[in-house]
């Protein structure tokens, strides 16, 4: 077979004789990404519910990364990384003889894709190795940083994931240049395929910015200003060198990564204390990114034809220069430089806007990165000047200038938050450098400090719950509302902590605050009665009781359908306090839509069925789990405001497969209601009599060919028991998504 990739692809795309005379292009071969989406690009992409299948993991299902990581001698690993940092390689020479700044950028850009709005992105799975992130313009030449670390990865093998290694290398880089970090936690397990479930923006060209509307309003859930950037354009908005306009972009993008103004200033200043930018020549000299590079480059991209193509001739961002006189040492020189000069606009050799001291000041104060006989003036970026001229950032920056110890502490904490924000609860942290301090952004829950309920207690509590007057609908809806806040990306949310009783969750529209308060009041009464009757110190948290009550309701509904099942329940959840709940941070978890409850908030860009798929993805559900849960929740009456939409049963509150049987009934015809594009009417095909109403979410299980295949399984006469047992299994999975103590 030919070794020339381009020739092979060209031949594949050439029209063969006898083809359609108007077919100017061939559809891609399946190996090139062809398939159904080429014909129907708007069809539901259920593949996002089959992420990282076990068959794609070369380590096998039995591999335990946490156990493997615990075998590491972490100080020895860090020494090996430190050795890499100060051993310059001819194929990619280190600036100033130290790869530390390079590794900080790599770690930052690994973690910096995180956005709080949907919990996706971040460094938790090592996605920087894969497209599109490995080829983003903002990640230029970071392929070399990972190659430099390959000897360390090779030595420690599967005990050290790429995801952990990239973040750890950033920490070691900081420490090797004199900075004291806040800590490090391992536990990021590698995946083996790119994330196909992250919406990075609508643009189809690098650095496009179609994501804005109105007065520079950035589309949710995006966290960067242009396609292929981590945060902001360092030259200013769309390359306009306006520090105040840049400050607005900085504030918005960092806020979307859960950083406040002080953390933002500390991160930018701390990161730009080290290293330099690279723009030695015309960027047209730079070749394609890794994903577009020829086969023989072996995954390395951005080949540079300017001069030697490396070292002093490197081209990455197009900006050129260092911020401080001490680019590989931790000190306060960033702010000393920022406030020590007046700045004039200039351009780099690559033509990018940047700033230099006015009147030739600062000349000779900055060492050259590769030639000790040369020196330069410092350089600042438009985004750096924002820290001096923005009225909010400026006093923070001056305080850090005058109090370097405060900068060091703020940067250490912000760096730890940046690199650990998507790891979820502290229970997932591994290693000897995990900080002892509890941090609000970690969504802390108390440790269990009491005896847990046993099987007899659980049985007695179920009896009390079912005799309380609360309906199956109320109990199921409350448990679902508590647990379904979980997000698989950043591992936030879930039932542990019972934060559904706290602000902001108790006030969310989707949770029906008045109804929720009544249910929680009754459950709290049951909890208090249980505690009052105990003399052995045994307790049940409200978090546990909410889940237990929902399970009891499911069991009751199954019994009424003729099936005796037990919903798995393991106590051990605790109740968080309002003081340890960041209201603003938790507000990001509020569902804009929840198809499982047939809830659709106002102003949604996507139709309801796409939003259902997105929520199922956040809940780490498979397509069959999604299907059985919707069908079960409909007949259990868990809809928002007890709506009849999709309640395709004559016996609400009974766990039957009626939703599927009636949806697929050939005697029913469906048509839009005419009043609401999310509502459809199901009428008797013979009489025209209105029989049911349903939403887009409901009808998609009959319309989409893949979902219909699952629906047909559960609608079958022999699937009644299977439906119940599959629903119980999927329900239990959702209730336990945040129970890392059970792993």
Curated annotation (Swiss-Prot):
Q: Which reaction does it catalyse?
A: H2O2 + AH2 = A + 2 H2O; 2 H2O2 = O2 + 2 H2O
User: Where would I find the Tryptophyl-tyrosyl-methioninium (Trp-Tyr) (with M-257) crosslink on this chain?
Assistant: 108-231
Q: Where is this cross-link: Tryptophyl-tyrosyl-methioninium (Tyr-Met) (with W-108)?
A: 231-257
Keyword field = Heme, Hydrogen peroxide, Iron, Metal-binding, Oxidoreductase, Peroxidase
| Requisite cofactors | heme b
**Entries under Pfam families matching the protein:** peroxidase
Give GO cellular component annotations, separated by semicolons: cytosol
Q: Does the keyword Oxidoreductase apply?
A: yes
Give the Enzyme Commission number. Answer: 1.11.1.21
Instruction: Give the residue range of the signal peptide.
Output: none
Catalytic positions? 109
Per UniProt, the cofactor note for this protein states: Binds 1 heme b (iron(II)-protoporphyrin IX) group per dimer.
Locate the residues binding heme b. 272
The record's region (Disordered) falls at 1-21, 275-296
A GO MF term: heme binding
Q: Which NCBIfam families match?
A: cat_per_HPI, PRK15061.1
The UniProt entry's sequence similarity note says:
Belongs to the peroxidase family. Peroxidase/catalase subfamily.
Functional description taken from the UniProt entry:
Bifunctional enzyme with both catalase and broad-spectrum peroxidase activity.
Give the multimer and partner information: Homodimer or homotetramer.
Q: Which PANTHER family match?
A: CATALASE-PEROXIDASE (PTHR30555:SF0), HYDROPEROXIDASE I, BIFUNCTIONAL CATALASE-PEROXIDASE (PTHR30555)
* Official protein name in the record: Catalase-peroxidase
Q: What is the lineage of its organism?
A: Bacteria, Bacillati, Actinomycetota, Actinomycetes, Frankiales
**What is the name of the gene encoding this protein?**
katG
């Amino acid at each position: 077979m030919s070794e020339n990739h381009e020739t092979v692809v060209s031949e594949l795309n050439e029209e063969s004789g006898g083809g359609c005379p108007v077919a100017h292009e061939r559809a891609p071969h399946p190996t090139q990404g062809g398939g159904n989406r080429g014909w129907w690009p708007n069809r539901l992409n259920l593949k996002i519910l089959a992420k990282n299948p076990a068959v794609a993991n070369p380590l096998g299902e039995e591999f335990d990364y946490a156990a493997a990581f615990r075998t590491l001698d972490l100080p020895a690993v860090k020494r090996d990384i430190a050795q890499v940092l100060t051993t310059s390689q001819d194929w990619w020479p280190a600036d100033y003889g130290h790869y530390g700044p390079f590794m900080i950028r790599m770690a930052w850009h690994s973690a910096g894709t995180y956005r709080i709005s949907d919990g996706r992105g971040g460094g938790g799975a090592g996605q920087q190795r894969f497209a599109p992130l490995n080829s983003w313009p903002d990640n230029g030449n970071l392929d070399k940083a990972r190659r430099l670390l390959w000897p360390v990865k090779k030595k420690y093998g599967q005990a050290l994931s790429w995801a952990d290694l990239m973040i750890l290398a950033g920490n070691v880089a900081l420490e090797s240049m004199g900075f004291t970090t806040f800590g490090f936690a391992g536990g990021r397990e590698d995946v083996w395929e790119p994330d196909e479930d992250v919406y990075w923006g609508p643009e189809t060209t690098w650095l496009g910015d179609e994501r804005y509307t109105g007065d520079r309003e950035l589309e949710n859930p995006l966290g960067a200003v242009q396609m292929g950037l981590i945060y902001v354009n360092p030259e200013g908005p769309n390359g306009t060198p306006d520090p105040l306009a840049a400050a607005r972009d900085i504030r918005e993008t960092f806020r979307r990564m859960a950083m406040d103004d002080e953390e933002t200033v500390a991160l930018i200043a701390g990161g730009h204390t080290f290293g330099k930018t690279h723009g030695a020549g015309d960027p047209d000299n730079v070749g394609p990114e890794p994903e577009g590079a020829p086969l023989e480059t072996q995954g390395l991209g951005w080949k540079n034809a300017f001069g030697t193509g490396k070292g002093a001739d490197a081209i990455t961002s197009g900006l050129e220069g260092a911020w401080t006189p001490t680019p590989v040492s931790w000190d306060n020189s960033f702010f000393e430089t920022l406030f020590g000069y007046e700045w004039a606009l200039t351009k780099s050799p690559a033509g990018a806007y940047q700033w230099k001291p006015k009147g030739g000041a600062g000349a000779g104060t900055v060492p050259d990165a590769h030639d000790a006989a040369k020196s330069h003036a410092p350089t600042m970026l438009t985004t750096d000047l924002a820290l001096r001229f923005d009225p909010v950032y400026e006093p923070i920056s001056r305080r850090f200038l005058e109090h370097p110890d405060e900068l060091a502490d703020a940067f250490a904490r912000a760096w730890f938050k940046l690199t650990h924000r998507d790891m979820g609860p502290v229970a997932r942290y591994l290693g000897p450098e995990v900080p002892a301090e509890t941090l609000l952004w970690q969504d802390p829950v108390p440790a269990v400090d009491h005896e847990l309920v046993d099987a007899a207690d659980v049985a007695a509590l179920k009896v009390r719950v079912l005799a309380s007057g609360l309906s199956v609908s109320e109990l199921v809806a409350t448990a679902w509302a508590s647990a379904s806040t979980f997000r698989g990306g950043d591992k936030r949310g879930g039932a542990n902590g019972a934060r559904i009783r706290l602000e902001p969750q108790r006030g969310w529209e989707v949770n029906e605050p008045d109804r929720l308060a009544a249910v929680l009041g009754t459950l709290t009464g049951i909890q208090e009665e249980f505690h009052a009757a105990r003399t052995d110190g045994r307790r049940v948290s409200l978090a546990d009781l909410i889940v237990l009550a929902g399970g009891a309701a499911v069991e009751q509904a199954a019994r009424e359908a003729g099936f005796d099942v037990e919903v798995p329940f393991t106590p051990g959840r605790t109740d968080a306090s309002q003081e340890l709940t960041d209201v603003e941070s938790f507000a990001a978890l509020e569902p804009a839509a929840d198809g499982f409850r047939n809830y659709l908030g106002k102003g949604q860009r996507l139709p309801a069925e796409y939003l259902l798929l997105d929520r199922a993805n956040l809940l780490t559900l498979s397509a069959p789990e999604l299907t059985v849960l919707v069908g079960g929740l409909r007949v259990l009456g868990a809809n928002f405001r007890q709506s009849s939409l999709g309640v395709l049963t004559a016996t609400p509150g009974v766990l039957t497969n009626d939703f599927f049987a009636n949806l697929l009934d050939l005697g029913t015809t469906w048509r839009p209601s005419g009043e609401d594009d999310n509502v459809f009417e199901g009428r008797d095909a013979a009489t025209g009599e209105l029989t049911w109403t349903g939403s887009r979410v409901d009808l998609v299980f009959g319309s989409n060919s893949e979902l219909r295949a699952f629906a047909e399984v559960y609608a079958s006469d022999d699937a009644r028991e299977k439906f119940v047992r599959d629903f119980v299994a999927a329900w239990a999975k959702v209730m336990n998504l945040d129970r890392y103590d059970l792993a």
